[in-house]
Amino acid sequence: MSSKDFFACGHSGHWARGCPRGGAGGRRGGGHGRGSQCGSTTLSYTCYCCGESGRNAKNCVLLGNICYNCGRSGHIAKDCKDPKRERRQHCYTCGRLGHLARDCDRQKEQKCYSCGKLGHIQKDCAQVKCYRCGEIGHVAINCSKARPGQLLPLRQIPTSSQGMSQ
């Protein structure tokens, strides 16, 4: 569904605030599609929760009633009668198994966004890749392949088999 579709009724050809089925009414803020004029065709939906056509997930009877423990509908995980599914805890800070980031003893260490290793940040990383020239070892702001203040559009970045052309 595009941003031009009216989410409340699923029909097109009108402004959200003038929906003949109600919905946004004249409310301010938060309305999906508010201010967008739709096309002239009726939309066909398929719910990604239950797979039924003719409804979207927003109106699905299963929404909010799927158990994250057993995967069945009708209850939520805290009320599940099945044994709790064992989940492997994975730390997003250090990458080790067995704990979560909030419990990591290495939380204070710097983590590089380029290589994912601890102990340095991206500007000091030897494996960082330049968005201007594609070479490894520097970032775009420090690239010598372009004139100061000039950014090379991505379409002009040469491939490894081509040279720089200006």
Swiss-Prot record:
Keyword terms: Metal-binding, Repeat, Zinc, Zinc-finger
GO CC annotation terms, alphabetical: cytoplasm
Keyword Zinc: yes
Protein name: Zinc finger CCHC domain-containing protein 13
Zinc finger (CCHC-type): 4-21, 45-62, 65-82, 89-106, 110-127, 128-145
Domain of life: Eukaryota
GO BP terms, alphabetized: positive regulation of cytoplasmic translation
InterPro entries: Znf_CCHC, Znf_CCHC_sf
Family annotation (Pfam families): zf-CCHC
